[in-house]
């Protein structure tokens, strides 16, 4: 069974003074409010789509002046910062093997691999000798890659059920990629709200800033924006994303 999943994180810090979309009546499956830590089961429930993720909206980018705004692209704004590039990365074949405390600022990731973001970790892990460092690339255009039945409420059985032994996911039931990097907020962003934008994460992720739990997002290929203003500090900040295949 040849199946593939692509993970790509395209990230940007977007600083703006516009109001939070969370003030509107949220869509079903979106929830808001302070939560100290995830339960670890959010990725198994189709009823829970997001925590503290901004409501879907058109692309919004602030600019410092009209001339910059006429150039349209966000990189022409001093209130936009890209987080694309090398991130510290750890690959685990299943959720139980993941480094559970990696989001804590005191957790040492200096020995981790670097991985370019955005990228597919499966493809990036293909070595020159043909060996696979980060799991098996899976290609499929319609069937789901985990064991299931077409039946009402079958989702309650979860994605970790044992599939046939000839399935690629028999060995790597649900891979987890742990991503971390540092960033700094420009001084002239003081007094503004700061949002982080993920332009596509497949298929689920938790987010922490400076060791504090921000929320989670499903819906792999849609943009996920979070207001991270309350979690920021002056100087170096740490962003951590835990991605489930």
Model region roles, listed by residue range:
Residues 1-3:
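Short, Lys/Arg-enriched N-terminal segments with co-localized hydrophobic residues
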Residues 5-10:
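Sec-dependent signal peptide recognition
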Residues 23-197:
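Extended carbohydrate-recognition surfaces in non-catalytic/accessory domains of CAZymes
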Residues 199-204:
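Short proline/glycine-enriched turn/loop motifs at strand-loop junctions of beta-rich domains
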């Amino acid at each position: 069974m040849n199946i593939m999943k692509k993970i790509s994180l395209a990230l940007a810090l977007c600083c703006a003074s516009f109001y939070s979309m969370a003030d509107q009546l949220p869509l079903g499956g979106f929830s808001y409010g302070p939560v100290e830590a995830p339960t670890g089961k959010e990725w198994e429930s189709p009823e829970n789509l997001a925590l503290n993720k901004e409501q879907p909206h058109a692309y919004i980018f602030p600019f410092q002046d009209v001339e910059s705004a006429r150039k349209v692209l966000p990189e022409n704004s001093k209130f936009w910062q890209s987080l694309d590039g090398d991130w510290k990365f750890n690959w685990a074949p299943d959720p139980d093997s993941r480094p559970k405390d990696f989001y804590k600022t005191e957790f040492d990731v200096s020995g981790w691999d670097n991985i370019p973001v955005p990228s597919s970790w499966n493809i990036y892990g293909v070595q020159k000798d043909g060996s696979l460092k980060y799991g098996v690339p899976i290609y499929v255009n319609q069937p789901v890659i985990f064991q299931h039945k077409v039946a009402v409420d079958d989702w309650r059985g979860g994605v970790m059920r044992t599939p046939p032994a000839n399935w690629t996911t028999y060995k790597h039931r649900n891979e987890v990629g742990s991503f971390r990097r540092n960033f700094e907020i420009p001084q002239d962003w003081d007094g503004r709200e700061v949002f982080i934008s993920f332009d596509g994460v497949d298929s689920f992720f938790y987010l922490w800033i400076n060791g504090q739990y921000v929320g989670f997002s499903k819906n792999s290929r849609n943009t996920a924006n979070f207001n991270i203003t309350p979690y920021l500090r002056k100087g170096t900040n740490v962003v951590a994303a835990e991605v489930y295949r």
